[in-house]
């Protein structure tokens, strides 16, 4: 399963490149299919030496890596922090989240109603 064209990110402010918006199209043949997930991404002062902070805006049930109280993604649980170098990017992070959503153990999780947010 490829994340190609299933993840996107953009900024609303070309002056401040710390804050980004992201979207993930739910993987096909999963409980996430036909859903668009919105995320907020903060590339801190140490980015790209350190990965960004990522938070789901759209409510999602993905307890293997998403804090169910606030939507923050634990990047360590999906292998993003291990081996991170300054050549890695926001695209890599979103791709790793997409692949976590596509894992067999996550494909059938019941999901909150569409349109709900953290």
Predicted regions and their residues:
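Domain-scale recognition of soluble eukaryotic interaction modules
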Residues: 1, 23, 36, 51-118
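Start-of-domain signal
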Residues: 1-30
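Intrinsically disordered, low-complexity N-terminal regions enriched in serine/proline/glycine
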Residues: 8-9, 18, 36, 46, ...
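Short, well-ordered turn and helix-capping elements at secondary-structure junctions
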Residues: 24-28, 43, 60
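A generic structural motif
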Residues: 28-30, 45, 79-84
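Proline-anchored loop/turn motifs at beta-strand termini and strand-loop-strand connectors
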Residues: 42-51
């Amino acid at each position: 399963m490829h994340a190609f064209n299933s993840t996107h990110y953009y900024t609303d402010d070309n002056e401040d490149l710390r804050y980004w918006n992201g979207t993930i199209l739910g993987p096909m043949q999963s409980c996430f299919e036909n859903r668009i997930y919105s995320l907020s991404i903060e590339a801190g002062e140490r980015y790209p030496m350190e990965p960004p902070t990522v938070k789901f805006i759209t409510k999602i049930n993905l307890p293997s890596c998403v804090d169910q109280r606030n939507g923050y993604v634990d990047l360590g649980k999906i292998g993003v922090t291990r081996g991170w170098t300054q050549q890695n990017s926001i695209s890599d992070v979103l791709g790793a989240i997409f692949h976590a959503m596509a894992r067999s153990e996550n494909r059938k999780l019941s999901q909150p109603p569409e349109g709900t947010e953290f």
